A protein has these predicted regions:
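NAD(P)-dependent short-chain dehydrogenase/reductase
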Residues: 133-134, 145-197
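N-terminal Rossmann-fold cofactor-binding loop
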Residues: 30-40, 53
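Conserved Rossmann-fold NAD(P)-dependent oxidoreductase catalytic core, especially the SDR/UDP-sugar
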Residues: 95-131
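N-terminal Rossmann NAD(P)H-binding glycine-rich loop of SDR-like oxidoreductase domains
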Residues: 3-24
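NAD(P)H-binding glycine-rich loop region in Rossmannoid oxidoreductase-like domains
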Residues: 45-89
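Glycine-rich NAD(P)-binding loop of the Rossmann-fold in SDR/ketoreductase-type enzymes
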Residues: 81, 85-96, 130, 138-141
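Conserved catalytic-core motifs of eukaryotic protein kinase domains, centered on the activation segment
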Residues: 78-84, 119-122, 163
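SDR active-site strand-loop-helix element
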Residues: 7, 32, 68-72, 108-114, ...
Length: 197
């Protein structure tokens, strides 16, 4: 049975991945959380690890893991709430995880973003030059580990389990109101879908 550690298991993507793998008997799922109330309203305490990537030492995480999926990150709308911590989380922390995984022979999957690309050139692929123009895209670009790991550059949409900060939550709250959108806009995102992993 493969053991998976999901870093950021109570975020939008992380909780979807925890739920997906918990329903599969081929995996033993562990996940990290920061807020106990959020974590245990939605999951049981089994295999849950309190971990704050800014204050806790990654060396204290369990090492008998086969895969680490890094879902920890500051999303674009919150980037400027604390720019220093956003850069530490998006740009520095993934390299710490990557080195820890390498030293412990753990396979790493790092969730990045398609925002490492500006969108000006279109039809990007995994070898395309990162040309982000904003701080968020640049922070995520800097955070892509160079050690051997799988990097998924995607855009997700879904609901947060602990706050009404997502686009879907906002759209649902607009019941009866006109909501503006886009025409002829290409988007290749996922609905917080763990199946991409």
């Amino acid at each position: 049975m493969n053991k998976i550690l999901i870093l950021g298991g109570t975020g939008m993507l992380g909780n979807a991945i925890v739920r997906h793998f918990k329903n599969n008997n081929n995996y033993e799922v562990h996940f990290t959380y920061r807020n106990e109330k959020v974590a245990f309203e939605n999951f049981n305490k089994e295999n849950a690890i309190r971990f704050d990537c800014l204050n806790d030492n990654i060396l204290n995480l369990p090492k008998n893991i086969d895969y680490v999926i890094n879902c920890i990150g500051i999303i674009k709308p919150f980037m400027y709430n604390d720019i220093k911590n956003s850069i530490l989380i998006n740009s520095v922390f993934p390299h710490n995880v990557s080195n820890w995984c390498k030293n412990n022979n753990i396979r790493m999957i790092h969730i990045s973003t398609d925002c490492v690309f500006s969108g000006l050139h279109g039809k990007y692929n995994e070898l395309s030059y990162h040309d982000a123009l904003d701080d968020y895209g640049k922070s995520k670009s800097l955070g892509e580990p160079k050690n051997k790991c799988m990097i998924l550059r995607t855009s997700i949409i879904g609901e947060e389990i602990h706050k009404d900060a997502s686009l879907i939550s906002w759209t649902k709250s607009q019941k009866g109101k006109e909501v503006n959108g886009y025409l002829n806009h290409f988007w290749n995102g996922c609905n917080s879908g763990p199946k991409m992993i």
